[in-house]
A protein has these predicted regions:
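Membrane-interface helix/loop boundary segments of multi-pass membrane proteins
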Residues: 164-198, 230-237
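Membrane-interface helix caps and helix-loop-helix hairpins in membrane proteins
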Residues: 159-160, 206-215
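Mid-bilayer segments of alpha-helical transmembrane spans in multi-pass integral membrane proteins
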Residues: 112-128, 159, 163
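Small-polar-interrupted transmembrane alpha-helices in polytopic inner-membrane proteins
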Residues: 119, 189-208, 221-222
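Hydrophobic alpha-helical segments embedded in the membrane of multi-pass proteins
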Residues: 176, 218-231
Length: 340
């Protein structure tokens, strides 16, 4: 068997496509982040009248740093997936789960509602058990900015992260892994399920360097990957995963004031709190995603996603076309009648 190219299509095999896309993404994101940081430094220095050096020294503490990272991640993932789709996968960009029909947007709204409700349940359970103490509300962490303006910062960051992480982990990685695993003896649905599990495990691994990460938090983030990927596995679209991801993070960090995978995005928060209770259940410094309550919410998210898909489509089944290669472009073998 040819190790690099598929003899039938001439495309690179799935492992090489995955590797090249990921390397492109890892090169583009820091490059774009540095370019955005330089642009911000120059603009701020010009507006403030300060020299570049003091502004550069203040950059690591700037509340805009998460936004720079979010925008760089968004552009880097979109560009790397588009390039890989165009030149490696040979499939249109929309085939990575972005067929923006009316039903797509309805599924997105469902996902957003579900992510908000799941995190609200985690908060209310902890509040009822006395594991959190509220210390403030409607707090802005941007100097001189009112709350309504400051809260746009985490909203923008979580919109970027929710979109680009789903496009990367589910839209590109899960799809290509499923195609690569669609081998003799493994039916297409089985390949999709295997790819779902493997891509979720890799999603957990990607969070191992986050602050306060533990082996347990890594396992639970992998479970979050299963929850987020479930809607994609059932529909072949990213609408439900993106919706859940955006509001899960926003309500976790900007509404209830929890850490999000160990990170504090800043900007503003509707509520501020002191975290108590057992770390095993709450996730401690990693946030709810690292605790049993968060894991329970993820399991509930899988259940509610299945119920929604059953309601919308009449059945709950793995979307086998995820494991299929792109359809060949139609090229007529002879000119139409009446034309030379």
């Amino acid at each position: 068997m040819e190790p690099f190219f598929d003899g039938g299509t001439g495309r690179l095999r799935a492992p090489w496509r995955l590797l090249l896309q990921y390397l492109t993404y890892k090169i583009l994101v820091p490059l774009l982040a540095n370019l955005l940081a330089v642009a911000w430094v120059l603009a701020f220095a010009r507006e403030s009248g300060l020299s570049g050096a003091p502004v550069v020294r203040s950059l690591p503490d700037s509340p805009l740093l998460p936004l720079i990272g979010g925008v760089a991640g968004l552009v880097g993932v979109v560009l790397s997936v588009w390039l890989a789709g165009r030149f490696l996968d040979r499939r249109p960009f929309v085939d990575f789960g972005l067929h923006l029909s009316g039903g797509w947007w309805l599924d997105l709204l469902f996902g957003m509602a579900l992510g908000a409700l799941l995190m609200t349940a985690v908060f209310l359970i902890q509040l009822g058990l006395g594991w959190i103490t509220l210390t403030g509300s409607f707090e802005s962490f941007l100097p001189g900015a009112p709350f309504w303006l400051a809260v746009l910062l985490p909203a923008a960051v979580f919109l970027c992260v929710g979109f680009y992480e789903e496009l990367l982990s589910r839209g590109y990685q899960l799809r290509n892994a499923a195609e690569g695993l669609n081998l003799p003896g493994v039916n297409p649905r089985g390949a999709v399920v295997l790819a779902w599990v493997l891509s979720s495990a890799f999603f957990g691994y990607l969070h191992t360097s986050n602050p306060n990460a533990t082996p347990l938090s890594t396992a639970f983030v992998a479970l979050a990957g299963l929850m987020l990927g479930f809607g994609y596995v059932l529909t072949g679209e990213l609408s439900i995963p993106i919706g859940i991801h955006v509001t899960w993070n926003f309500f976790q960090g900007a509404v209830f004031g929890f850490p999000v995978s160990g990170l504090r995005i800043g900007g503003a928060t509707f509520l501020s709190l002191d975290q108590g209770g057992p770390d095993l259940w709450t996730g401690g410094g990693f946030g709810p995603e690292g605790g049993l309550l968060g894991a329970g919410a993820m399991a509930a998210g899988i259940l509610f996603t299945a119920l929604w898909v059953r309601l919308r489509r009449g059945e709950v089944t793995v979307h086998a076309p995820i494991a299929e290669g792109p359809k060949p472009a139609y090229r007529p073998s002879h000119p139409p009648e009446g034309r030379q």
